[in-house]
Amino acid sequence: MTTTKIKTQWACSECGSYSPKWLGQCPGCFQWNTLVEEIHSSKLKTSSYPLSSTTPVPLNTVKFQEEIRISTRSKGWNRLLGGGTVCGSLTLLGGEPGIGKSTLLLQISSQFAEQGYKVLYVCGEESVSQTSLRAQRLQISSSNIFLFPETNLEDIKQQISDLAPDILIIDSIQIIFSPSLSSAPGSVAQVRETTAELMHIAKQKQITTFIIGHVTKSGEIAGPRILEHLVDTVLYFEGNAHTNYRMIRSVKNRFGPTNELLILSMQTDGLHEVENPSGFFLQEKVVETTGSTIIPIVEGSETLLVEVQALVSSSPFSNPVRKTSGFDPNRFSLLLAVLEKRANVKLYTSDVFLSIAGGLKITQPSADLGAVLSVVSSLYNRYLPKNYTYTGEIGLGGEIRHVTHIEHRIKESIIMGFKGIVMPSGQIKGLPKEYLDQIDIIGVKTIKDAVRLLQ
């Protein structure tokens, strides 16, 4: 009589790498306390995927076929995905619990259903009545949306075969399990295998699939890193529970540009696209105040204006405080060091706080100039030129370096009615004459030149 040998392995919940024994730190991604136990059978496992019968073909003989895309009423959603949702694609939507992922996909499902597409919504985390109540609140009622409260992957595959949907939504991948695996739902093996199975179904049957995934405390999608490599598109749902706006950012897209940004407003009847993001973020700006600048930032094909606020106060302690919100703290420390060294602005006895108004997170270096001038304005309690925007990267030598998409930043400043823009002097030459006629452009070469703008 033969017995099946059981083998224990430890898998990292962050990157999916394996270790034969428990380790405090993952050898793959170097994260701490991420290894979880998994039990594997030595019994030979056969793949459930059919063997491929295709043969290699020369590259120059392949005929290009344009992807078939499904458009919705939301222009922002279509832009986010590169011109519409590609048929047969697999999209991963990640976000914190309660931020509105299910609400968003239910609204998108309604727009698909309006066009006659059949939608299978697998609501594994909620009952049919709970999902139906949400649909009523969103004023959604369609005979083309089918709710299926199931977590067993085999039952889901059977319903896909019977119903033949055009759109499949999995809410959420962390609760779906395959009975062929002994590990618990949400484990590394379950998330990896169920996603791979769904990807195969999406490609084989040309079913457009959306998967909801929860994020960890660090803001990354929970589960192995390979999850993001398997799917075609990765969208991050960002926002704050204390504000009524949400942002969706595309960090991966095989069928379109990345780093696209969609800003939504959460209201009682669901999520609504914000058509004027710059006006949305500047609507609460105080007209006359020190320590405040407006900077133009570019997110994908979208340009928007946001406010940078700084507060500098004397510190009673030997180690002054440096705090940021929405701005890279390491980058901020570097900018303060350059400010002291190259512009002789003394901050070693002051607490310095910097915030991006509205809760946005900015990583692009074009925000350097606005951040530094906000700090200096607050320190000296002096005003900067009124109705100007500021853009420029600051180097370690104190020089103001070029930024990308400068024409887009100038154009957005003109549209929003600003009087002028402060920018790197080296980029003024070559600008279209129409911009020079519509807005006052001030060029700065160094950080010292920028500080002299203070009244």
From Swiss-Prot:
Protein name stated in the entry: DNA repair protein RadA
Coiled-coil portions: none
EC number, as in UniProt: 3.6.4.-
Keyword Metal-binding found: yes
TM annotation in the entry: none
PROSITE patterns xrefs: RECA_2 (PS50162)
Signal listed as a keyword: no
GO molecular function terms attached to this record: ATP binding; ATP hydrolysis activity; ATP-dependent DNA damage sensor activity; ATP-dependent peptidase activity; damaged DNA binding; serine-type endopeptidase activity; zinc ion binding
Xref: SMART domains: AAA
Protein family (similarity comment): Belongs to the RecA family. RadA subfamily.
Organism of origin: Chlamydia muridarum (strain MoPn / Nigg)
Region Lon-protease-like, residue ranges: 351-455
Record-linked SUPFAM superfamilies: P-loop containing nucleoside triphosphate hydrolases, Ribosomal protein S5 domain 2-like
Function recorded in the entry: DNA-dependent ATPase involved in processing of recombination intermediates, plays a role in repairing DNA breaks. Stimulates the branch migration of RecA-mediated strand transfer reactions, allowing the 3' invading strand to extend heteroduplex DNA faster. Binds ssDNA in the presence of ADP but not other nucleotides, has ATPase activity that is stimulated by ssDNA and various branched DNA structures, but inhibited by SSB. Does not have RecA's homology-searching function.
Enzymatic class: hydrolase
GO annotation, biological process: proteolysis; recombinational repair
